[in-house]
Amino acid sequence: MGLIKKQIEFLDKFTKGKWTLNEKTGLVDIEGDFDCSRNKIERNYYGGVKALSDFKEVKFGVVTGNFYCVHNTIKSLKGSPQEVGGNFNCSYNNLTSLEGAPQRVGGNFNCYHNKITSIKGAPQDIGGDFFCSNNNLTSLEGSPQRVKRFFGCSNNNLTSLVGGPQEVDDFSCGGNPLASLVGAPQVVSGYFSCTNTKLTSLEGAPLEWKGNYSDFYRNPISEDTINLVWKTMRKNKIDYRTALISLKGEIPAKDWKKMSSAL
């Protein structure tokens, strides 16, 4: 089945490179980039920009470069590429789900500033960063288990990190109502940040951290206490409860009162 006029115009307008239609599958492959972000759309007579709400029923197959559809009103990723060689960015839309997202992304995957409630459907093979911050996530179930670079899930409604990746370079989970780090990645080779949460327990904190910078400010427990307990856990390869008991008398009374409830 061929493409209709509006679909051809859509592809011609936003493709930087060459697009081809696979007559057997009905999928459009692109050798190059595709960018239908709002800033790429022509302004109307009054200076406004009409955002896209969908992909004009075009179904994409493989995009060798980047695929961008940022700052629109897209509600579904149905029809988006199955594979992207570069970056995939669908941020600042009205998405509530990642169903239909590409399953392989060679670069970064960005879906921040949407209304996404579940990460299920997210790509499992990612070559770069994974950003899902500023959504309505209550769970990380469905996340890729290994992210080669940065994983950011800040500013959601997460009360647990269960289901998230277990191996990352950098990790940020700030701005969530987390009381502990249960489910956090166990191998972090770079930056680790957990700021502005309800953290009163380091249960689940990674025991293998090769980085040189971390953030724990604006939590119920002081940053100094958190770093002391975490360092003790890592140095001695012991769990949170054991580390806490070993530090009794060294932790300020205010922090001890909040943390000792785990004992």
Predicted regions and their residues:
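An internal, amphipathic alpha-helical element
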Residues: 131, 173, 191-205, 216-219
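N-terminal capping/linker segments that flank leucine-rich repeat
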Residues: 1-59, 226-263
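LRR N-terminal entry segment and analogous cap-like coil->beta motifs
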Residues: 13-90, 106-107, 111, 127-128, ...
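Canonical leucine-rich repeat
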Residues: 44-45, 52-58, 77, 84, ...
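Leucine-rich repeat domain C-terminal region
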Residues: 196, 207-241
